[in-house]
Amino acid sequence: AEQQSVALPRLLTNDVSRFTFHESPSAGQLIRQRRSAVSFDGKTSIASATFFQMLGRVMPAAELPQLDRPMPWDVLPWEPAIHLLLFVHRVDGLTPGLYVLVRDREKLPLLQQSMNEELIWTPVSGCPDSLPLYWLLEGDAKKAAVQVSCHQEIAGDSAFSLGMIAGFEGRLREGGAWWYPRLFWEAGLLGQVLYLEAEAAGVRGTGIGCFFDDPVHEIVGIKNLAVQSLYHFTIGGPVEDG
């Protein structure tokens, strides 16, 4: 079957040892130089290998006991709840469109059942086998990314942006209201890892705290509270302050 196209929302009309990570400055240097981008140049692309490498760093190796997981995922005493809905704009070798990174393979059925049943979950060609990355929709996703991000151009001028999609209702029903802030702790840790990975790759990231969650859900057909969009992030070539 042919891949579907990205539709605009109705809005205002693992095994990380299998990855070869790039050589980079020391962790201390990256942490000290880490900044949030205020705008992107709308033209910088990143290599698919760099993209896969970044995604590899956010994989928590959920199949392992907590203390055997790669840093920093060994600090979270629960199974990963958040997965990434990726708006890919400028990644060399990847077709622009929407993708999903499933951070815990056991949650793939939950995600598939929570989204439009007509979506085709196509494993990404050339992606490491240990990275559960799926291509959902083909097409220019820049306008959709900008619209759902409160019309912020940073979501479309980047190399890619993403929404952090969390298993929601089931977690809260099973664990109680205390689960809600913990979902954001996990989202925050994801954001910090992405910030440092962007710096290591010679680009820059920034969080997107303003977004329209219902239109995000609409793009992939999320119709209930089983999963919810909690936070957004974007990475690309920064425009430096003068």
Residue spans of the language-model regions?
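Acidic, surface-exposed loops and disordered segments
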Residues: 1-242
